[in-house]
Amino acid sequence: MDIDNFIRAKGAIFSAIRTMLSSLDFDVSMIDDVYVAGGIGSGINMRNAVNIGMFPDIPLEKFHYIGNSSLTGAYLMLLSTAAEKKTYELASNMTYMELSTVPTYMDEFVGACFIPHTDTGMFPDVMKDQQNRK
């Protein structure tokens, strides 16, 4: 059961990334940085996370762990009116997306529930590393 839950969580993360990128007509090559926050980022090996298809196959230098960002943000808002103003400004510029209502999301999710994915072409560096290990 734990493995099933992990695979579903990994699939949800990757399919959410793909769905959001697709909604903007972006692809993974356009990602400059990925900020990983919270408990998942503190102990994760990013190379392994990419290898299993949790995150896109992009250079590891683009991934940044930023800690407990919600707690830090709340703390800064309490201490600084400038930070509070910036927080509201950022929030007003965000777009909410209900992934379950996006027609392609479930297809993305199902494909992402395989390791690394049913479309291994999205993971060229991972596949090359696997070939080199043989």
Predicted regions and their residues:
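Helical "lid/coupling" subdomains associated with nucleotide-phosphate turnover
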Residues: 1-134
